[in-house]
Each structure stands twice: as C-alpha cells, then as structure tokens.
Amino acid sequence: MSKIADDQYFNDEEEDFAKLLEKEETLEKGTIKEGLIVSINENDGYAMVSVGGKTEGRLALNEITDEKGQLMYQKNDPIVVHVSEKGEHPSVSYKKAISQQKIQAKIEELGENYENAIIEGKIVGKNKGGYIVESQGVEYFLSRSHSSLKNDANHIGKRIKACIIRVDKENHSINISRKRFFEVNDKRQLEISKELLEATEPVLGVVRQITPFGIFVKFKGIDGLVHYSEISHKGPVNPEKYYKEGDEVYVKAIAYDEEKRRLSLSIKATIEDPWEEIQDKLKPGYAIKVVVSNIEHYGVFVDIGNDIEGFLHVSEISWDKNVSHPSHYLSVGQEIDVKIIDIDPKNRRLRVSLKQLTNRPFDVFESKHQVGDIVEGKVATLTDFGAFLNLGGVDGLLHNHDAFWDKDKKCKDHYKIGDVIKVKILKINKKDKKISLSAKHLVTSPTEEFAQKHKTDSVIQGKVVSIKDFGVFIHADGIDVLIKNEDLNPLKKDEIKIGQEITCVVVAIEKSNNKVRASVHRLERKKEKEELQAFNTSDDKMTLGDILKEKL
C-alpha cells in the first residue's frame, strides 16, 4: 500500500495504537531491559528489580504469579522487564516486555509483505479507540472503524478473522482490520466460487462442520454448504450418519449467491445418477433383495445397494392389519426380499412390498374352509356392532346379531380381548376378502325350543312385556311373542297393561329369524268353531241363538 493510500485508510480521528496503549494499557514508550530481582515484598504485592546502576523499578507481583497463585520468580532471579519512565524508581512491567517481544518477533516474521495477511484471534480487551485482539500470544490493535462490530454489544471473548493493514516497528504495534478482511475474503470467495462453478471435474474438500441441515466443506480457504438434500441420491439424509469433521470429500459447486455470499456445493452431483441406471433394469413386479436402513412409525426405508432407497409402507409389511409399529417385524441392517410395486425415476420414488411375496392369509383360509365349517377364533377387537376374531392370519366378523339369539346382547358386554370362541362360518366374501361368523348358530335357538313344545294353532299364555305401535309383545315359554294390532281383537289395545296375562294362539314360527307370532282374534275364532262343532254333534236341541246368548 502506498503512503498516500495508507493515510487515506486511517482517518484523523484514529489515534496511533502506541498512544492508545499509552493511555489505556500503560504500554508507554520505553526500553526492554534485562533486570535482576533484588527484593520481594509479598505483603505490599511488589518486587524491586534492578535495571542497571542504582536504578530499581517496582514490579507488581501479579505479573509474575501463575494461575495457582505461585510466584514464577524468586529473589536474585534475572527477569526481562519493560522500563516505562526515568528516575531512580521507574515503573517496570514483565507482561509489557513479553508482549512487546512477541509483537516485535511477529513484525520481523511478517517482513515487508505483511499487508492483507490474515490472522484469527480472540478479542481480549477494549479501549476508547477499539479492541485488543490476541492471536498465538501476540496482541493486535483493531480500531473501532475497522471492526465492523456493533458499539453497544459486548464482544470480549469473540473470535474473529482480520487482515493486517499496518505495522509500526518503532512503537511495536500491529494494526488489523476486520472490514478489510471481509473485502478481501469476499473478492477471494467470488473468484474461487467462479472457478468451482466453471470446473468440469469434482474437487476435493475437507468437512469443516456438520449441522442438522447439511455439512460445510472447506476448499482453498473458503466454505461451501452441502445441503442435506445434496448429499445422496436417496434424498434428504442425516449428515452425521455419513460424515465427520476432517473427512475428505469430493464436491461440485452448483450455485453462488453473490448478495448473501453463499456457495452451494453438492456431493451427489459428483457421482452418476443411479436412477438412470435402474430405470431400464427394474420393473413393477420384480422381486429384489434389500437392506433395512431406517425405521419410522409410518414405514421402513430400504437400501437397494446403489445409493437409492425404497419405501416400504407399514401397510405393506404384513397381511396383519394390526401392525402397531414396523420395528415389531423388522430391524435396521436386516436383509429382506421385497416386491417392487411402483417405480418412478422422474420423481425418484420406489415403493416396495414385503407382504406381497407371501400368500395372502385370506386365500389360504378360503382354500381350507367353506361355509358351514366350525372354527375357533381369538377376540382381537371389540366394537359397538360386534367383535373381530383372529382365525390365524385373517380376521372374521362376529356381528352382535350373529353372536346371540337375544337381540339386545352385545359382544363387548360378554367377551374380552383374547377370549377364544367357537364359531360357525356363515359367509366367505371372496371379492371383499371378508368372513362372516356366527356363535348363536352353534346353540339351539329359543324359537327351536319353543317349536318343540308348540305348533301352529297351539294355545299359549304369556305376560305383556312391551307395547309397540305395531302390536304387543308377550313373554311365553322363554321367548317374546308378537301379537300384531289386527290380532288383538276383541281386546282393546289402549286398555292393555304391562304384566297383564293374555291367552292367544300361535299363528307363525320363523326359526331362521327367531320370531313367533300369535293372535287373540284367531283364538276367539277357533273357540267359535269348536263351539259350533260341538253344537252340531250334540243331542241337545239348543239353538245357535241360545249358545250365543249363553256366551254373552
């Protein structure tokens, strides 16, 4: 940098680092001397150091005390100190001497080509003109105007990168600029990014940091981000499962945002697209061998061996509809055979099935059983309308009305999960893959028991148990019998009470529907016929009118 440019770079408001240190850090101009500790006064916290002739300087003991509180020097030990003023008892500093020596050594190391050299250090101090930055034991001055830091924030302890912009051999100071670093770094990053974007071959970088959203890879001193979706052709993956800090990896640049200064890299772009490889080799219906790579509650991801993952939905794991979690059937690393049910290279989707390589339990059941067979099933699910029984790989429905002859009974009130029930197969629906079962058909129905005692036109007697719009139910011989409204005559329905005994005659017995109908009216007609028949066969010469009068 020229003298004119140098003067322009530092405005008039900035004070020389040496002067600032003189005011805030008391690093005043002076000399470094090899002295000798002549006395130590621990009570007052200082030591006297002879720096030549009769001159003795006062040295604060905290400058030569280690982290454990032990003195690093004793009486008569030689020590290098910085003499900051003249007189018989000048102030001397061990730390200033060491710091000044390190700065001077760094200046000599840098030589004349120091400009824009990059250092990385930590902010360890602050004064009114800027900040003190320490790097590898050397202190640098970062003026406020070159810091690119907010004035109202506490930056002590913050690690930064900056460029060296001035060295002062006479005053033993080195000035740095964070602002210049950004300018130089942005220019360099743009140049390297363009170089990467124009490159036709992958370049080798080093993994610098791993985050949940991707990995940062360093190349020629700049960082680029490989988003987790650009790591593998499998799609978004967990970066930690693939890489660790320090790993070498080939990458390609895919974009650079000049406004945000972000370089986007890709790992998967460095290898051939495996989807192009398989699109002509694999078809729906093919059986392939895969390895379980990840298990979620909704399904399983499987690796087909060439950086492509297929998806095995939870519903395609087993014919059992009650798969609570895939981990109950499969484990990570397990090798299995699956059937391809859908392949879409354009959208990079591969769906597979495990259960379709096994016989459908319904088909197996249907081949071994037929309607009318008696089987045993275990209660798997209870609902308001019935129970599902596991029949060994396939479920059958035992509806409430097929479980009990009593239409008011429900399975959930009489069975519990795990109960084993003997049932009869009522129906096998091949189209919908459904099986209907019955438990009540294995026991004699109340109607059948009733039919063994009573025939049509038999006279029965029962008590009224319910009154409906369409008729009256009486309970007779263990079964409810319906008397329709038109069969109640000569009884008046509005006069009938619950618990009232009614005598009637059986008019219908429906065993299949478990129903019995009766009639009071028919009983009356039957009685009339019997009386008329008795009159016709009797020797008594009573008239029909007499008989009717007697009846009334």
UniProtKB/Swiss-Prot annotation:
Alphabetized InterPro entries for the sequence:
NA-bd_OB-fold (IPR012340), Ribos_protein_bS1-like (IPR050437), Ribosomal_bS1 (IPR000110), Ribosomal_protein_S1-like (IPR035104), S1_domain (IPR003029)
Q: Which UniProt keywords apply?
A: Repeat, Ribonucleoprotein, Ribosomal protein, RNA-binding
- Taking every annotated instance into account, which residue ranges of this chain make up the domain S1 motif? 31-101, 116-179, 200-268, 285-355, 372-440, 457-521
This protein's name = Small ribosomal subunit protein bS1
Q: State the signal peptide span.
A: none
Does the keyword Ribosomal protein belong to this entry? yes
Gene encoding the protein: rpsA
This entry's Gene Ontology molecular function terms read: mRNA binding; structural constituent of ribosome
